[in-house]
């Protein structure tokens, strides 16, 4: 460069003129090349859209907006229609996604065309990269829409077919529902073949109902004398015994010439083969011959299932027509043929009902041996009703085949449990010498086994095989003698664990995104047109040039014409709110970094922002902040993560119900998810006694949550003393901040000092109780505690000047403002207006040094159940607390207002642990409330009262701030105070 400068100095006027001309020519060539490149790029941008994008937008309008498409019609919750409804919802969600993507790409393409009208090198480079990115996304839209269109065409006329399946046989509806779930596209494309299948299944069902096996039915003209003879021949017994004896004679196996044909023969099964744990019966077994091939839907002639024929043949109970027996005194009215098909057993039932006598049932024994209990079966699902967890039992052990026998014991008369008043017999039937008496037992098989409820947590306790193999009695049975009662399933004892960060499994699952995202975008665009119309009505030359939709509000960027004043647009905030039919709008004039005015309008529907979403966001996972705290989601969709170490203190204020307490819980949980108790400690002060007390007992606390405002002032003064103690320790090793001090401690193998965060949930109560002490302690901590790793988080719902004094505000520059009632309160918190126009429910304005203006965020929501699971998991963690051992006495503060400084006549010296507490202090060589808590296993309040009693007895000295209490006696002097 210097050489060129020396060379230029040697040029004369002619040479300089020539150089200027060359530079002008070069600049002109560069400009022409830039314009040509921008022109070519703009032509490519105009042609980058694919026809499928416009088609997707058209379908989106027809399905969502106009609702004139077949996909806009909801289907009923029956079997086949419910399966098709799942397909319909999937297709609607897909077109919402595809159409929304196409609209977004089209918006970006139009914006790129506008930018390329005034090209620069930066604009051309940026738009070229964006053009390549959009080309890939257009190809994705094209591919996804073509696939969706294939499904949409196959969906046509299927709602009517699904309704026909629901009106037909249950097995057919179950089959088509299963196939729609497994092979969606292939099933919908085979519409004609499915219609033929429905026709065949309907005909077979109708034929099966009209032509029952004739050889198995009794003669219609059965005389009463025949039944009388049958009754005289059967042994005396209960009603069920006589009924079983009669059925055994009616269902005697036919001869070789009496076997029904294969077309009408019932299936040989025990009644449970076609019941699956979670899937309805497969029509391949219920409609034989129609599903020989999974891919071939061509109906074939029905044939009998290929099974080894037993000798002699055994009839299934499901093939026996159900007996319509009335147990009332009066005989049941026979139904007309219009109501039901003629029942060949009706006359026999009426004869037996008239001739039966009342027989007492055999009582059920109190205890049944485990070997006599039948194996549990899965509960049968009623036809046409999907299987649920409530009526499905887990699969049992394989059933052993029973030897064929023509007696009643071979027939499973309990197959249809919903028609019988009791469950299966408790004991197997004896030999055919006599007809057994059927004892009604509780329906053990109909009760599904309850699933074990797993406790939330990242490390569930495994169940040993031995415990898993123990057979439990039924819920209504007493445990057998000599056998201990089994423990409830799913209840596991959870012991202490090692230190570990909380798992994301403790949080609620991630919520689904807003389903009507495209509709919300369309509403936002319509509001932009309304804003332009309103500005035009008031004679303002300005228009909306861009918008950004956030979770709570949408920011419209308004570009005023040259010469238009910003104040005129800002003064129309109430008129714009009226035109948009919203509660209020916030004007940000101008938007930092842009030459536009921001108009923030509340959304009609909020998008959920949860703490789980925030922790899963890369902004929190990959942050380099020393003390990362999750603040919320901005309007542009980015997650804002702050650094408490840089703030270094934070003020949170807002009216009741605005989200202040949830924000404090979010800040605390953010730190709990990043730091162990050895790295971060808390001091929590909660005068309201309801907000921070759920955190009581976690290992991060230096002392229990302070709820007494009188004690809070002493705790804050103790924190000041601890801060001074840290400064002395740092000065001794030559460290300027906590990081340098801990680095030196690691080098010599000493214990490091953790960060300390002091949280005050309601500052107003403390300022009313002891304003001077609290304000002076907060002022000193805010001024000096940053270098020692101590930070303050103050929260209040009374943002008045007597609570947030000038001294506190000057030393706490980082602030969060929630919705307040007036602009005066907003100025008290932020020194500017805007918080009075917030919408509540976590809508906040955040400001810290370095920001030009407050940033609007939507705070994440964390439920009380999530906080409870996290704190329960943390309370189980055990570790050697060296920090409390060394510095716990610094935070004792004022324990009780009736302590040594008060009226000693009110003290109760009858505590049985008083002598033991004195002995602990003598053994330790110093008096410490935390040591009394640990050694005596008592709470903080009782340990503090014991320390006050010892001070009143002159056994220990008075409280000395950060120093431990001095012990004034020896062990040999204890008899003088407590006797021998």
Curated annotation (Swiss-Prot):
Residues 213-226 have a biased composition (Acidic residues). Residues 375-385, 395-406, 449-463 have a biased composition (Pro residues). The keyword ATP-binding applies. CDD domains: TrwB_TraG_TraD_VirD4 (cd01127). InterPro entries: AAA+_ATPase, FtsK/SpoIIIE/SftA, FtsK_alpha, FtsK_dom, Ftsk_gamma, P-loop_NTPase, WH-like_DNA-bd_sf, WH_DNA-bd_sf. SUPFAM superfamilies: P-loop containing nucleoside triphosphate hydrolases, Winged helix' DNA-binding domain. GO terms for molecular function: ATP binding; ATP hydrolysis activity; DNA binding; DNA translocase activity. Residues 464-484 have a biased composition (Low complexity). Keywords: ATP-binding, DNA-binding, Nucleotide-binding. ATP binds at residues 654-661. Residues 201-292, 366-495 are annotated as: Disordered. Residues 636-827 form the FtsK domain. PANTHER family: DNA TRANSLOCASE FTSK (PTHR22683:SF41), SPORULATION PROTEIN RELATED (PTHR22683). Probable DNA motor protein. May track DNA in a ATP-dependent manner by generating positive supercoils in front of it and negative supercoils behind it. Although strongly related to FtsK, it lacks the typical transmembrane domains located at the N-terminal part of FtsK. Belongs to the FtsK/SpoIIIE/SftA family. This is Uncharacterized FtsK-like protein DR_0400.
